[in-house]
Amino acid sequence: MNSTRNHPALPDGWTKGAVMALLSEIAPHIGLRPARLAVLIYIIGRTRASDWTSPNREPVFFGAQDFAAVELGKTARQLRTDEAALARLGLIVKRVTANGARYGRAGLGLILTPLIARLEEFIALRDRLRAERKHLRALTGR
């Protein structure tokens, strides 16, 4: 985690828990299927809370892929596929060594700053979806 560069950080009042709740609400609308949402929530949950709010740090998941796969009830290959899909969706960046190793001290692993950078977009989507649901309830009298 490089401490000399500025990175996107969560706005005041936001926590990684709030980000997880937001993602759960909008997941289908950003192409995030339930199994991949579970992987993303797992990854987020294993980062330091302070890394989400400091512009001098990046939230990085550097846990071993094999161990994470076991905890998620997946094979390592399935988890690699999920990680690649999360990267294609612009939610993470994989920064690993040539052999795929991840190291916390070196800031190598699954980087979550792209997710933070898109937070405003996701909040706007959530607000739009809530407004649409409210409008539909008004139309149906519910």
Question: Which residues fall in each region the model found?
Answer:
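Short, cationic-aromatic polyanion-contact patches
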Residues: 97-119
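Short recognition helix of helix-turn-helix/winged-helix DNA-binding domains
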Residues: 1-60
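Extended alpha-helical scaffolds
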Residues: 117-142
